[in-house]
A protein has these predicted regions:
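A short acidic, Gly/Pro-enriched loop at the edge of an enzyme's catalytic core
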Residues: 101-112
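Class I SAM-dependent methyltransferase SAM/SAH-binding core
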Residues: 58-101
Length: 244
């Protein structure tokens, strides 16, 4: 979940090394990542190499590995605190920056690269996607998820002059929008901008779907589930793309 700011200032580095910064993948994200991975691995012959970029505390990776046994899963993250927690889950772990630098993996070694709610934390999204494409085998899959700037409730918030949910103007507090947790989001995407970026970086066969957001107020959850059918308005954008 924590994506190492390789070329950013001390403020971001300190933020991601702060043990109070949330590292947990969360049950919803972990389950949907496991489902996407299991569905993708059905087409892979033999043991697969799965790389989880920004693995955080390893919860999502561990659930995915249990759902799809027999495969090798490598977790990469910058936060030493996150990797310390992930180590107890029995994963293969690498501490490395993932923002603006090369991943410490050989070209064409991964069957699947997971970027689960990490891209919104990065300064250099182009380089991160270039690296994901590089380490994938031909025909390999990228599984990516990210909050949706154009989520159905964000459209309403913008209309009344409020900051959209998921967006942040400070690393020290939340201002002008609902919520209180600073997550370190630097980039936000709509389904259209994300599709365009992935295509520009060389990915093909781009498929989008939507997912709900766990922190939506209870009374609004039925609407949030309904909007999952429209990725452009869903809370979370899920992407499956291939290296062609």
């Amino acid at each position: 979940m924590i994506g190492a700011p390789a070329r950013s200032g001390g403020g971001l580095r300190q933020f991601y090394e702060n043990p109070d910064v949330p590292l947990s993948s969360g049950a919803d994200r972990a389950r949907r990542q496991a489902r996407m991975l299991a569905d993708t691995l059905k087409d892979v012959t033999g043991p697969a190499c799965v790389v989880d970029v920004g693995c955080g505390d390893g919860e999502a990776a561990a659930i995915a590995l249990a759902t799809s046994p027999g495969h090798r899963l490598v977790g990469i993250d910058w936060s030493a605190d996150a990797l310390c927690r992930a180590k107890a889950r029995g994963l293969t772990l690498i501490r490395a920056a993932v923002d603006g630098v090369s991943l410490p993996l050989r070209t064409g070694t991964a069957d699947v690269v997971i970027m689960s709610e990490i891209i919104e934390h990065l300064v250099d999204t182009d380089s991160a996607l270039d690296e994901a494409l590089r380490v994938l085998k031909p025909g390999g899959s990228l599984l990516l998820s990210t909050p949706n700037l154009a989520a159905w409730y964000n459209r309403g918030l913008l209309a009344i002059g409020m900051q959209p949910v998921f967006s942040e103007v400070s690393l020290r507090g939340v201002f002008g929008r609902p919520g209180s947790v600073v997550a370190g989001h630097l980039r936000l995407f709509t389904s259209r901008s994300l599709t365009g970026l992935l295509s520009a970086r060389g990915f093909g066969s781009i498929e989008l779907s939507g997912a709900r957001y766990h922190d939506v107020p209870r009374l609004l959850r039925p609407a949030d589930r309904m909007f999952c059918a429209w990725p452009g308005a869903a809370s979370i954008i899920l992407v499956r793309a291939r290296k062609t």
